[in-house]
Curated annotation (Swiss-Prot):
A zinc finger (C2H2-type) spans 116-140, 150-172. Disulfide bonds: none annotated. This is Zinc finger protein 821. Residues 257-366 form a coiled coil. Keywords: Coiled coil, DNA-binding, Metal-binding, Nucleus, Repeat, Transcription, Transcription regulation, Zinc, Zinc-finger. May be involved in transcriptional regulation. It is found in: Nucleus. One of its GO terms (molecular function) is RNA polymerase II cis-regulatory region sequence-specific DNA binding. It comes from Homo sapiens (Human). GO terms for biological process: regulation of transcription by RNA polymerase II.
Length: 412
């Protein structure tokens, strides 16, 4: 049975997405509009100024202290107050018609309830549109990820894609719920994270091309639009969302061409492509270091676990049937030496499993997440050093089997 990780045809190439959204992300980061009543914000800042003026410090010292706090980022509250204060000072510059523009902005923000959906939940920045919101929020996410993995800010687990990070972050949320940032669908479990849509949200004027994209089965579900839940402060975006897919197709033509080419390719071309991908993957794995190999295996196991959590009963039955057929074909063609080595490995795996079952639950979970601990436990049980190559492993297993047979015969 092949344990190779299969390629995902629905995977989004985030490098191409970020390249297409780079300009809009830059514009979103440069915007300075803050939702809410500017008058109330000015009153709050005036109260803070009155409190500070009662102290014995001078205004010059206060400005220097504020600048030091902003540069060092040691106080989030003072930094936010100074940021809003600077924005209000910019609005108070002697420019003609500035008060009229301020009233227009306040009126528009109060009159449009859907405009809050374009507000960043992390820095409260008004992005103006859904495209800019997506590009801006993933700038926050990119700050906590490495080149090959997306790190969870709560537990530090490395995940292979933003979609996997979003599904993983549902574990840390209190109510196990979240909303898609584009279509507004509420996800109540891991199985429905990429399936539920809200037709009312998809019919908004800001997304006119996505009319009636939502499934009719979602009408009987809970479609009450509530504020989104952002586990660990990360905004979640549904990878299979119809509205999000429309945005990606409109901004990255290469993604659309890639999907159409994969969908319409003949069987022979598909087999040749898969063979090329297997060859390239094998060459990459031959040149990787032991640390990279361990990280890749952990990432593959996590991705396979998440994939199996989302599969339906029919998909699971088909997968098990394929695995049984592949195992039957592989065992029919194996040599007696390979069969003997396989039986020994299965016996040792059962012994290791039984020993893990006798452990405490927390200790068992710790062993399951630590490959070095598993290797040490296996080495203690098998009486030889790990890791070793496949040929050495088979020879040592055969030698150990012969030694056990001699001991059993001498005892009898």
């Amino acid at each position: 049975m092949s344990r190779r990780k299969q390629t995902n045809p629905n995977k989004v190439h985030w490098d191409q997405v970020f390249a297409g959204l780079e300009e809009q992300a830059r514009q979103a980061m440069m915007k300075t509009d803050f939702p809410g009543d500017l008058g109330s914000q000015r009153q709050a800042i005036q109260q803070l100024r009155d409190q500070d003026s009662s102290s014995s410090d001078s205004e010059g010292d206060e400005e220097e202290t504020t600048q030091d706090e902003v540069s060092s980022h040691t106080s989030e509250e003072d930094g936010g107050v100074v940021k809003v204060e600077k924005e209000l000072e910019n609005t108070e510059q002697p420019v003609g018609g500035n008060e009229v523009v301020e009233h227009e902005v306040t009126g528009n923000l109060n009159s449009d309830p859907l405009l809050e959906l374009c507000q960043c939940p992390l820095c409260q920045l008004d992005c103006g549109s859904r495209e800019q919101l997506i590009a801006h929020v993933y700038q926050h996410t990119a700050a906590v990820v490495s080149a090959k993995s997306y790190m969870c800010p709560v537990c530090g687990r490395a995940l292979s894609s933003p979609g996997s990070l979003g599904r993983h972050l549902l574990i840390h949320s209190e109510d196990q719920r979240s909303n898609c940032a584009v279509c507004g669908a509420r996800f109540t479990s891991h199985a429905t994270f990429n399936s539920e849509k809200l037709p009312e949200v998809l019919n908004m004027e800001s997304l006119p091309t996505v009319h009636n994209e939502g499934p009719s089965s979602a009408e009987g579900k809970d479609i009450a639009f509530s504020p989104p839940v952002y586990p660990a402060g990360i905004l979640l975006v549904c990878n299979n969302c119809a509205a999000y897919r429309k945005l990606l197709e409109a901004q990255t033509p290469s993604v659309r061409k890639w999907a159409l080419r994969r969908q319409n390719e003949p069987l022979e071309v598909r087999l040749q492509r898969l063979e090329r991908e297997r060859t390239a993957k094998k060459s990459r794995r031959d040149n990787e270091t032991p640390e990279e190999r361990e990280v890749r295996r952990m990432r593959d196991r996590e991705a396979k676990r998440l994939q199996r959590m989302q599969e339906t009963d029919e998909q699971r039955a088909r997968r098990l049937q394929r695995d049984r057929e592949a195992m039957r074909l592989k065992r029919a063609n194996e040599t007696p030496e390979k069969r003997q080595a396989r039986l020994i490995r299965e016996r040792e795996a059962k012994r290791l499993k039984r020993r893990l079952e006798k452990m405490d639950m927390m200790l068992r979970a710790q062993f399951g997440q630590d490959p070095s601990a598993m290797a040490a436990l296996a080495a203690e049980m098998n009486f030889f050093q790990l890791p070793v190559s496949g040929v050495e492993l088979d020879s040592q297993l055969l030698g150990k089997m012969a030694f056990e047979e001699q001991n059993s015969s001498s005892l009898h």
